[in-house]
Amino acid sequence: MHRAGRGAYAEIMSLRPFHLAFPVRDLAEARRFYGEMMGCAEGRSSNEWVDFDFYGHQIVAHTGGDAGDRASNPVDGHDVPVPHFGVVLTMPDWQALADRLTAAGAEFVIEPTIRFEGQPGEQATMFFRDPSGNALEMKAFADDAMLFAK
């Protein structure tokens, strides 16, 4: 598959939504974090799981513990949590989420920041954990066509 320039990004953006299921200690905590703090609409649920609309993608919090090990890799002088998941947002949506999380008192693993400023692939990023320890990275690019820039 050819993946170069703006055409590749348009192709990527036509992908279907992803689905991710992950463990949480408590569904009420997950509802507060993903629903109230992050603003994700709730979908179907049961006593053991709850769906959230994660920027057009389906994530499902399942009872069954926490995220387990808290491994990390050094990146740009920060300890980046591994594994982690997230979404590439528009810059205005990223800033709105950063403001929302900051106002709600979120504890960031890596504070909202700009990486590669003035370079190809310039991006805004932030890392944080949900109450069960699942790590999330939310990012946005100054130029979406630079998603895979080297």
State each model region's role.
Residues 3-12:
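Short, Lys/Arg-enriched N-terminal segments with co-localized hydrophobic residues
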Residues 11-18, 40-91, 96-129, 141-150:
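Vicinal oxygen chelate
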Residues 28-29, 92:
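Short alpha-helical
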Residues 30-35, 101, 133:
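Conserved active-site tyrosine of GNAT-family acetyltransferases
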Residues 135-138:
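Short glycine-/small-residue motifs
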